[in-house]
Amino acid sequence: MIINDINFNDLYQQHLKACNHYNLPPTKWDKKAPKMAENLVGKPSRYNETLLKAMNVQPNETVLDIGCGPGTFVIPLAQQCQAVYALDYSQGMLDMVQQYKEKYQLNNITLLHKSWADNWDDVPQADVILASRSTLVDDLDDMIEKLQSKAKKRVFLTSVTQRHFLDEGVFEAIGRDD
């Protein structure tokens, strides 16, 4: 067997089923949005600082933040780059981003109300794409196709690391014991 013979999308979907994973509807995220904004936006975090440093976004670059939530990365990125496209399927999360956009007078943020499953023909390309903990999708192939079509330079993906979802070997490899 060679790698091209492996259907990674099928394996991924089987894994999601085995973990009893399901995506929350946008209305659940709408309800969580104010508290998440309070707890996450503008708060120091080793994860956030490490990811922003690794992304090394330049002033002349654009960023597409997929699953942007309440603006955890949108706000600091908008303060350092040309433009940020904040995409989320929760209107409540986008409402939080809008509040921060107004508070900090960041006119370089564009809100996009879409899900991974939606048609993305009108989503602009960006130099840098970020999908932080927002890649638990139903169709891995479709996600990869969207990332490829929208990225001009770099893509940064991170995943959730809850124990029920990942193999113990992954935790050992990344040095986590919590």
Features from the language model and the residues they span:
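A short glycine-rich, Lys/Arg-flanked "PGG" loop and its adjoining helix->strand segment in the class I
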Residues: D141-V155
